[in-house]
């Protein structure tokens, strides 16, 4: 009934569905536990002892303690809580399963404690390792690389609530050939991403879109404005690219992760006092609060962007277990709102979307993911042609430039 190619795709459907659902459940469990722990640390506990959660004492103390605890986990847990996200790419080969409990615990404590990183890198690492460990036993004919692709696709679908991001990302890596078309290669990853996104939607839906005025019609001047905004965002991101490896090397001369992360947490606390609670945590909920605020002005948006960018660099350089995409989206949104407040003639839809495109492009160096994040935060079909055009000079600016990553150090 089916062509042999179709039968091959159908055989991969079951493991793809299982991996997609499992990837989402791991993410949901981690986020739920972190959310409950966050409410306890930042609401119930300070209220019970009569301290305001946004007081300088509480912010500095909580983030310093978070750094010390994460440092203890990294030093003493088996596998040292997995690889350092500042060194490893988002998608990499499986790590030892023995490192996963420490990595998951370090992620949850970091998220709950207010560290300015997202969950994407540790969750990706955990899901890839679990998929390779269990999948190789259940389906031994499927290679470790295939499990890595399926787990990363399922995780991307779960993280962003849609399989579109996974389809875009893997369309550039799983290229077709004369014998195997690209969509044959995409079938199983897209199935995993769809299963991951649908499972996530049963429990919660990630809120990326901001309440920004509709963009009516593209004009030539808007293309120039968008390119300038993206260039400004890239310039800001390249400051982080320059700082991260140098700060990472400086901090890791101390050798002791408890000391490194304790110092990192203390600095994050100081930055949190300067920027306020909006600059804490992974940034998605805080981005919504920032966009809905009626009291923030251009200076406030500038402060939020600068503090969050500094916090992102400090958190990554210290070795906290977390990802950099979600904070980059917050920084881009704050930068875009600041630029619109300065030059109201440029629509906020352009400044916000193009700033996010530029920042995410610096962080990920992935054009499709950058376009996707800009489009979901400002969901306006009229913007898509403009974003595609603005991507071209932005990509030229970053061609050959160093990545937002630290260098490996000899122990």
From Swiss-Prot:
Keywords: Cell membrane, Ion channel, Ion transport, Membrane, Transmembrane, Transmembrane helix, Transport. One of its GO terms (cellular component) is plasma membrane. The chain crosses the membrane at residues 9-31, 57-74, 95-117, 148-170, 186-208, 223-245, 258-280, 295-317, 322-341, 345-363, 376-398. It is a multi-pass membrane protein. InterPro entries: Chloride_channel_YfeO, Cl-channel_core, ClC, ClC-type_chloride_channel. It holds the Pfam family Voltage_CLC. It is found in: Cell membrane. It comes from the Bacteria. One of its GO terms (molecular function) is monoatomic ion channel activity. Belongs to the chloride channel (TC 2.A.49) family. This is Putative ion-transport protein YfeO. The lineage of its organism: Bacteria, Pseudomonadati, Pseudomonadota, Gammaproteobacteria, Enterobacterales. The gene is yfeO.
């Amino acid at each position: 009934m089916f062509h042999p190619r179709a039968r091959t795709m159908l055989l991969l459907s079951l493991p793809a569905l299982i991996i997609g659902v499992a990837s989402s459940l791991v993410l949901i469990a981690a986020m739920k536990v972190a959310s409950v722990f966050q409410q306890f640390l930042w609401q119930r506990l300070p209220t019970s002892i009569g301290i305001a959660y946004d007081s300088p004492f509480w912010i500095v103390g909580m983030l310093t303690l978070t750094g010390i605890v994460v440092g203890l986990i990294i030093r003493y847990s088996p596998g040292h809580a997995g690889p350092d996200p500042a060194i490893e790419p988002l998608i990499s080969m499986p790590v030892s399963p023995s490192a996963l409990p420490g990595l998951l615990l370090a992620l949850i404590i970091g998220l709950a404690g207010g560290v300015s990183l997202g969950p994407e890198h540790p969750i990706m690492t955990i899901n890839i390792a679990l998929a390779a460990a269990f999948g190789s036993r259940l389906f031994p004919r499927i290679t470790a690389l295939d499990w890595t692709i399926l787990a990363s696709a399922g995780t991307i679908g779960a993280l962003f609530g849609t399989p579109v991001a996974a389809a875009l990302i893997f369309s550039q890596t799983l290229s077709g050939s004369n014998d195997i078309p690209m969509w044959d290669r995409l079938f199983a990853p897209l199935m995993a991403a769809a299963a991951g996104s649908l499972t996530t939607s049963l429990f919660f839906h990630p809120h990326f879109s901001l309440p920004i005025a509709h963009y009516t019609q593209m004009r030539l001047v808007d293309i120039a404005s968008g390119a300038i905004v993206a260039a400004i965002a890239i310039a800001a991101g390249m400051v982080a690219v320059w700082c991260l490896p140098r700060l990472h090397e400086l901090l890791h001369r101390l050798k002791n992760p408890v000391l490194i992360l304790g110092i990192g947490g203390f600095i994050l606390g100081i930055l949190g006092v300067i920027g306020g609670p909006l600059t804490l945590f992974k940034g998605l909920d805080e981005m919504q609060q920032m966009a809905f605020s009626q009291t923030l002005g251009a200076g406030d948006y500038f402060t939020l962007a600068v503090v969050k960018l500094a916090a992102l660099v400090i958190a990554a350089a210290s070795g906290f277990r977390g990802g950099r995409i979600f904070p980059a989206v917050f920084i881009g949104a704050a930068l875009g709102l600041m630029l619109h407040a300065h030059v109201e003639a440029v629509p906020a839809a352009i400044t916000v979307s193009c700033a996010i495109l530029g920042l995410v492009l610096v962080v990920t160096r992935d054009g499709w993911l950058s376009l996707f994040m800009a489009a979901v935060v400002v969901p306006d079909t009229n913007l898509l042609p403009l974003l595609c055009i603005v991507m071209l000079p932005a990509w030229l600016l970053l061609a050959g430039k160093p990545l937002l990553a630290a260098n490996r150090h000899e122990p």
